[in-house]
């Protein structure tokens, strides 16, 4: 490329003056070396003005032995610190290296002084970074592209195209990296507690709003996102958040309840979570979720779904919830559990929809005692099972049925949220005082919108008014 831009041939000794294009103008330099330095600086300036956004194309991202993952983690951290020292964005090639960072889940041995790589890791991280990395070995399990793709396929099936997407526990941002082309105009907001992971995510997705803090510290407005996706942390502990402390929620349940508050009525939350969210005997957390949302469906993943890239054998579920505008009159069946033919405790949803269990439920013995696990069929690929399960979810275009103008709602900056599925939309015969919040009606030839507090205001969305008034 450099040679094709020259106006005169440089001599082999580099002393011959040479001209190249810099900022769109031919500029002469005393030597090839000086021209190369100027060209490199121009490239770096262009990179700062328009840094690339990373797109995941490798379905095997993060796979490998513990040693391979450890080495790739170290390479990513070294590169991150080099980029930060130079105060510059990552190139597309450097993003490939950064994207291989998978955190330290399942790598407790890396933090043993007896490990031959221990000193490399210890010298590379600050004291705070080292403590955070060591603390993450139990729950920093990143999500494979196969699972993420299935979640986006389901969102598309529901009718989601573009909008404000929240990822409240993003790691290095695999959900952002797998964002389909058809959803590329979405506004992305991510939250990540771990400093290293969050800083890598910022280098991979420079156009996203990424907050490096605990989700409990965020102050997002309620009803401010169209969709929330992710793989939430799970464990037998709680976070301190004054608004939710009285509910005594375990961390994975907390992420659901808070995210449902942040998503608008009609919006969808799609999270990977522990099977305990649906199967545990205590229904309190599920009832809180049911007060806020309808369960569109759930997919139980085999306990090998995170084995290749996260090194974890754990049974997990993908839950798809659609935000309600008001609580239901009766709590749905999925807030409770029952027993299957083998006497195992399962959520009523899976008892009614066994086709959504991508394996066979069996009793197993773990280091913590007896448990149940979804054991896979070794002859069937997870990708094929997920594709079929997404189709079984149904609920086609529920997002579209909740919108007034299908092509514009998710790109609109209006403060009016789209009408929920059960709202009285465009029913001018309905008395105004009986309209539900977030509903639309025609009054005196004007399209009106009912806010959450009951006030009627003129709607900015006036298309179709002539049809409605005819």
Stretch-by-stretch model annotation:
Residues 17-22:
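Short aromatic-glycine-(Arg/Gly/Cys) micro-motifs in beta-strand/loop hairpins
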Residues 32-40:
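A short, charged, amphipathic alpha-helix used as a generic interaction element across diverse proteins
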Residues 40-100, 398-399, 405-408, 413-470:
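Charged, often flexible domain-edge or linker segments that flank or initiate folded functional domains
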Residues 308-399:
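Flexible, glycine-/basic-rich loop-and-beta segments that form/coincide
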């Amino acid at each position: 490329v450099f040679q094709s831009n020259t106006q005169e041939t440089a001599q082999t000794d580099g002393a011959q003056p040479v001209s190249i294009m810099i900022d769109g103008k031919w500029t002469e330099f005393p030597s090839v070396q000086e021209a190369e330095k100027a060209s490199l600086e121009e490239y770096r300036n262009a990179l700062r003005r328009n840094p690339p956004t990373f797109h995941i194309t490798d379905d095997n991202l993060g796979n490998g032995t513990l040693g391979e993952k450890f080495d790739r983690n170290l390479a990513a951290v070294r590169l991150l610190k080099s980029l930060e020292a130079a105060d510059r964005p990552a190139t597309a090639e450097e993003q490939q290296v950064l994207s291989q960072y998978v955190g330290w889940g399942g790598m407790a041995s890396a933090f043993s002084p007896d490990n031959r790589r221990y000193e490399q890791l210890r010298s590379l991280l600050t004291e705070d970074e080292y403590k955070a990395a060591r603390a993450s070995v139990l729950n920093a399990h990143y999500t494979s592209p196969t699972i993420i793709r299935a979640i986006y396929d389901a969102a598309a099936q529901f009718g989601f195209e573009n909008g404000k997407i929240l990822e409240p526990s993003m790691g290095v941002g695999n959900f952002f990296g797998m964002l389909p082309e058809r959803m590329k105009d979405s506004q992305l907001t991510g939250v990540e507690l771990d400093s290293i992971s969050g800083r890598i995510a910022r280098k991979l997705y420079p156009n996203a709003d990424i907050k490096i803090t605990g989700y409990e510290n965020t102050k997002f407005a309620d009803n401010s996102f169209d969709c929330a996706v992710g793989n939430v942390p799970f464990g037998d502990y709680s976070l301190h958040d004054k608004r939710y402390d009285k509910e005594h929620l375990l961390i994975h349940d907390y992420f659901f309840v808070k995210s449902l508050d942040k998503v608008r009525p009609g919006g969808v939350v799609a999270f990977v979570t522990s099977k305990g969210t649906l199967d545990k005997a205590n229904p309190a957390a599920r009832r809180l979720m049911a007060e806020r949302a309808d369960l569109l469906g759930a997919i139980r993943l085999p306990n090998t779904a995170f084995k290749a890239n996260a090194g974890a054998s754990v049974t997990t579920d993908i839950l798809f919830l659609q935000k309600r505008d008001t609580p239901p009159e009766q709590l749905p069946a999925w807030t409770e559990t029952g027993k299957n033919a083998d006497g195992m405790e399962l959520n009523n949803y899976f008892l009614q929809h066994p086709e959504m269990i991508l394996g066979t439920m069996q009793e197993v013995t773990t280091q913590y005692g007896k448990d149940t696990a979804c054991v896979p069929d070794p002859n069937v690929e997870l990708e094929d099972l997920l594709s079929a399960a997404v189709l079984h979810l149904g609920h086609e275009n529920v997002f579209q049925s909740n919108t007034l103008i299908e092509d514009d709602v998710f790109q609109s900056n209006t403060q009016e949220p789209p009408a929920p599925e059960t709202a009285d939309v465009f029913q001018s015969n309905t008395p105004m005082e009986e309209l539900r919040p977030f509903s639309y009606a025609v009054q005196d030839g004007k399209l009106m919108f009912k806010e959450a507090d009951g006030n009627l205001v003129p709607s900015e969305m006036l298309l179709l008014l002539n049809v409605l008034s005819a």
